[in-house]
Design a protein with these regions (language model features):
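NAD(P)-dependent short-chain dehydrogenase/reductase
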Residues: 56-108, 112
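Active-site beta-alpha turn of Rossmann-fold NAD(P)-dependent dehydrogenases/reductases
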Residues: 19-21, 69-71, 125
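Short glycine/proline- and charge-enriched loop/turn segments
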Residues: 31-41, 85-91, 156
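Mid/C-terminal beta-alpha module of Rossmann-like enzyme folds, strongest
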Residues: 109-167, 191, 200-211
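Helix C-cap/helix->beta junction micro-motif
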Residues: 7-11, 61, 143
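Residue-level signal for the nucleotide or nucleotide-sugar donor/cofactor binding architecture
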Residues: 98-101, 130, 170, 180-183
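Catalytic helix-loop patch of NAD(P)-dependent Rossmann-fold dehydrogenases
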Residues: 14, 22-68, 75
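NAD(P)-cofactor binding segment of oxidoreductase domains
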Residues: 1-16
């Protein structure tokens, strides 16, 4: 990414880097937010260390690079990379409020940013927080009434994982100034789950019905 950023800067070419917001850690995401200028403070996994370092380097190209931070990407597909699919298949879930990205809504907005050649860092997550339990409760209400799950604590989770998990709330002030139509996270996820239920995406595939 850095080589591309350097070359694009030299050639006056707009460059979009799709990074992550999983480079921060808050003890209580409901009480603090990270804006676009915040420095990475989560080093609990090699992934976050590399991504955090890259995020810092991208700030050196604020005149030519759009540095996009996404978190816990969500769609209406039963895809193993979909955050909803992941947590519905876990044996136990550690429920913590987090910022998340509903891709069918926010990817088109990212394309608009690219077309208008916006630069700098942007927290591309839906405004607000939602917990794992809130998502699973909606999943049970909308998609599968028979679904059940079991919780465990952060301490219990850390004992079985090879690396720790990032939990945080990203500040969406800039995003809402640029695109005020972006839905709050709970509303956007509900639309995805309604699409799952209607279109039976386990067989047919599909995205959230968000225009």
């Amino acid at each position: 990414p850095i080589t591309l950023a350097i070359q694009c800067s030299k050639l006056n070419i707009h460059y979009t880097y799709l990074g992550t917001g999983c480079i921060f850690l808050a003890d209580d995401p409901t009480k603090s937010m990270y804006n676009e200028d915040a420095l990475p403070d989560f080093f609990g996994s090699s992934y976050s260390v590399v991504k955090g370092y890259t995020d810092r380097l991208m700030h050196n190209f604020n005149d030519s690079v759009l540095n996009v931070r996404i978190r816990m990407p969500i769609t209406a597909d039963y895809n193993p990379r979909n955050f909803i699919t992941k947590i519905t298949t876990y044996s136990k879930v550690c429920s913590i409020p987090n910022s998340m990205t509903v891709l069918p809504e926010l990817l088109p907005i990212m394309i608009k940013m690219m077309e208008s050649k916006k630069v700098g860092t942007i927290n591309l997550t839906n405004p607000g927080l939602i917990s794992h339990n809130e998502i699973l409760q909606m999943y049970k209400e909308i998609v599968n009434p028979k679904f059940t799950w079991e919780n465990f604590t952060v301490e219990e989770q850390n004992k079985i994982l090879l690396s720790k998990r990032s939990n945080n709330q990203l500040d969406n002030t800039k995003l809402k100034e640029w695109y005020p139509e972006v839905l709050p996270i709970k509303d956007s996820i509900r639309k995805c789950l309604e699409d799952m239920a209607i279109h039976n995406t386990t067989k047919n595939g599909g995205g959230c019905s968000i225009n």
